[in-house]
């Protein structure tokens, strides 16, 4: 039986024009790490936390993502949590890092290529529903709400 592994990203400080600093994303990352450890019994050594200095550059993020991939086994469950700015440009969703945008679709594709049994993505950012995951059902919110 596999283990649960987590990559947690919390970005509070931004250098990009139009991206205001967010006061509590680092706190979100710390709180979700605690929740994963105590609520889901994720071993602390199986958690990579990126953003404890408030800043996550593209280099920091990609290094953490590659490290996350290296610790993953085929039967593991992966948890990816992001707290920070999100934006949409030309109908494409991006996560806003401290120094650069990164396509949410690219991150999903990267995570999808990691051979793990289960993958869960948590996006705590604006416009977080504006991307697609292959093989997932399209949700009709109004129909679901009326049937509820």
Protein language model regions, located:
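Boundary/activation segment at the start of structured domains
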Residues: 1-94
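Cysteine protease catalytic core and zymogen-processing segment of caspase-like enzymes
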Residues: 24-29, 33, 87-148
């Amino acid at each position: 039986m596999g283990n649960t592994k987590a990559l947690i990203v919390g970005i509070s400080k931004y250098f990009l024009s139009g991206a205001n600093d967010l006061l509590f994303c680092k706190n979100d990352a710390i709180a979700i790490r605690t929740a994963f450890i105590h609520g889901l019994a994720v071993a602390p050594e199986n958690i990579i936390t990126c953003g404890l200095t408030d800043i996550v550059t593209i280099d920091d993020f990609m290094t953490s993502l590659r490290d996350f991939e290296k610790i993953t086994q085929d039967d593991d469950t992966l948890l990816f949590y992001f707290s920070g700015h999100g934006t949409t440009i030309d109908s494409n969703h991006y996560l806003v890092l401290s120094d650069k945008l990164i396509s949410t679709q690219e991150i999903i594709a990267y995570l999808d290529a990691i051979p793990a049994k289960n993958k869960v993505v948590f996006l705590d950012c604006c416009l977080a529903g504006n991307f697609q995951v292959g093989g997932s059902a399209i949700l009709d919110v109004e129909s679901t709400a009326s049937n509820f």
